[in-house]
Amino acid sequence: MSQKQEEENPAEETGEEKQDTQEKEGILPEKAEEAKLKAKYPSLGQKPGGSDFLMKRLQKGQKYFDSGDYNMAKAKMKNKQLPSAGPDKNLVTGDHIPTPQDLPQRKSSLVTSKLAGGQVE
């Protein structure tokens, strides 16, 4: 029984060795490509923060996308002060449902519609 285990272990080791060599061969082309790119573009990868232009723009402060963003930021600075309503605070709307008789007469249009001409050819 011990002989069978010893026979199985060398087979497993050779399988693991094959995987290791395949991984090493797979890594070598990647390393070669990285070396080529580093030789071609030596300035890449040196600054973790990005380019000087980007760092300068980030140091200037917050920029707003449009006037809506600016107004929202401005409103936050005012500590959320809500504008007070005028003297009509007790005004209730929606208690009367209009009917066709309550509505004023519709004004006639000065320009006649081409669709309402009524002429059929």
UniProtKB/Swiss-Prot annotation:
PTM sites of type Phosphoserine: S2, S43, S67, S109
Record PTM N-acetylserine, positions in chain: S2
Main localization of the protein described in the UniProt heading: cytoplasm
Organism: Sus scrofa (Pig)
Molecular-function annotations in GO: phosphatase inhibitor activity; protein phosphatase 2A binding; protein phosphatase inhibitor activity; protein phosphatase regulator activity
Subunit structure: Interacts (when phosphorylated at Ser-67) with PPP2R2D. Interacts with ABCC8. Interacts with SNCA; interaction is disrupted when phosphorylated at Ser-109.
PANTHER family noted in UniProt: ALPHA-ENDOSULFINE (PTHR10358:SF40), ENDOSULFINE (PTHR10358)
Entry similarity comment: Belongs to the endosulfine family.
Composition skew (Basic and acidic residues), residue ranges: 16-37
Lineage: Eukaryota, Metazoa, Chordata, Craniata, Vertebrata
Gene: ENSA
GO CC annotation, single: cytoplasm
Pfam family, one: Endosulfine
UniProt-recorded name of the protein: Alpha-endosulfine
Region called Disordered, residue ranges: 1-53, 79-121
UniProt keyword list: Acetylation, Cell cycle, Cell division, Cytoplasm, Mitosis, Phosphoprotein, Protein phosphatase inhibitor
Keyword Translocase tagged: no
Protein location: Cytoplasm
